Design a protein with these regions (language model features):
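C-terminal transmembrane helical hairpin of 12-TM major facilitator-type secondary transporters
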Residues: 281-329
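Conserved MFS/SLC helix-loop-helix module at the cytosolic interface between two early adjacent transmembrane helices
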Residues: 73-109
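Residue-level signature of mid-helix packing/kink "hotspots" within the transmembrane helices
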Residues: 40, 68-76, 160, 263-271, ...
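Cytoplasmic helix-loop-helix junction between adjacent transmembrane helices
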Residues: 117-155
Length: 410
């Protein structure tokens, strides 16, 4: 009996880290889905805000950048300020601040209230990204590439659902009550998170897990540039997509369907592009997806509404899937093995680019045409191809190590 009890105790001790790891990953994924859903759900409101507040394309992009730019610009300060805070506290704080921003936007405070609420919500999301990523890497150590892919994928689930729900509700409700409902959803997620996530991270080998390679600052710096351009393409196209659908005769509900199709394709693209990278390598897979992105974006300029809706899931695969390959490479190229700082820098690059790029593309459209703005976004993806080729000397050793780790991990 004593031997049996000892065996049960040993089994429980072995299973506890696995259970806690799954809880950590689930907590990070739920919060990531909410915040990414908040981020891209705002696209459904852009045509309404443009009409109500009489904004140009560039002005609309500036309003959008109040959220996106705040989220990107505060990545590093948020990472530094909350390094001594437990994962539960950091993710709860991120969610509650974002909820406060949506509550402010939902109040009848005019254009100034909308802008202030966007900034507050952006502050909350700036906390979530680096702290959620570090929670996953600390939990899984050297085997974090696959869980990071799951974490990255969870964001696309939020992108696929919240924008569609918002677009479906907007023909029925005014836009402020819809924002209020999104805030209520955030409170529900905060309650779930409070009972789910542990107060501390579950592994003590973060020093080992952080030092898994790293080809130097040159490789990491180029990776952040590539990530920024990839995000610029995506956010630039998303700026114009609602207006492209309206121009084809679609309504608000059709815009929601179009966004959902694009984001569902993007979620599927996370798995597809990781699979592709294992066969073509990171360099070959990124080159292929960026070339396809350029061609498909330009193709949507010449297709009717029905054909455009058919193309959007395919475009979503390559438009959004590339980021998963780039994101999974961050720990291997992290300067000095500091994955927390590396993720914060990478997010600053991609989110900052996502905030600035629509302003640039919007200005191009304002001074020429919407079509030229869309073409500019597509050509940005093509510009990534030679940069990825230049990344090869830095990326190859780290990527090989990561793939070996991923294939050997349970």
């Amino acid at each position: 009996m004593d031997i049996a009890r000892a065996d049960l105790t040993t089994t429980a001790e072995w299973n506890e880290p696995a259970r806690t790891g799954r809880r950590n990953l689930l907590a990070a994924c739920i919060v990531h889905a909410l915040h990414d859903g908040y981020t891209d759900g705002l696209y459904a409101f852009l045509p309404i805000w443009q009409s109500q507040f009489r904004l140009s394309y560039a002005g609309l992009a500036v309003v959008r950048a109040l959220y996106y730019g705040t989220m990107g610009g505060l990545q590093l300060p948020a990472d530094r300020a909350l390094r001594g805070t437990s994962p539960k506290a950091a993710l709860l704080l991120a969610t509650l601040i974002a909820v406060a921003g949506f509550v402010i936007m939902a109040l009848p405070l005019g254009f100034a209230g909308l802008c202030f609420g966007l900034v507050i919500a952006g502050i909350g999301s700036s906390i979530q990204h680096p702290r959620g990523s570090v929670l996953v890497t600390e939990t899984y150590g050297t085997a974090s590439r696959r869980p990071l892919g799951i974490y990255n994928f969870s964001g696309d689930l939020g992108k696929a659902t919240l924008p569609a729900l918002a677009a479906l509700l907007l023909p029925v409700l005014a836009w402020r009550p819809v924002l209020g409902l999104m805030a209520v959803l955030g409170l529900v997620v905060a309650g779930i998170l409070f009972g789910l996530a542990p107060s501390i991270s579950t592994v003590e080998n973060t020093g080992t897990s952080a030092k898994r390679g790293g080809a130097g600052r040159g490789g990491f710096g180029l990776l952040t540039v590539i990530g920024g351009l990839d995000t610029a393409t995506r956010m630039g196209y998303l700026l114009f997509l609602p207006f492209l659908i309206f121009g084809r005769g679609g309504g608000s509900a059709t815009v929601g369907v179009a966004l959902a199709l694009l984001f569902i394709g993007g979620a599927f693209g996370k798995a597809t592009c990781n699979w592709l990278s294992e066969r073509l390598g990171v360099i070959g897979s990124v080159m292929a997806t960026e070339a396809a992105t350029t061609l498909l974006i330009i193709l949507t300029l010449f297709t009717p509404l029905g054909a455009t809706l058919v193309i959007l899931p395919i475009l979503g695969i390559v438009l959004n899937g590339t980021s998963s390959v780039l994101y999974g490479t961050v720990p291997e190229l992290a300067p000095g093995g500091d994955t927390g700082r590396a993720f914060a820098i990478f997010y600053t690059s991609v989110i900052g680019s996502g905030g600035v790029a629509p302003i640039v593309y919007g200005s191009i459209a304002d001074h020429s045409s919407q079509a030229l703005g869309i073409v500019s976004a597509g050509l940005t993806a093509g510009a990534i191809i030679p940069l990825v080729a230049a990344l090869r000397p830095s990326l190859r050793p780290a990527t090989l190590n990561a793939l070996e780790t991923g294939s050997n991990s349970p």
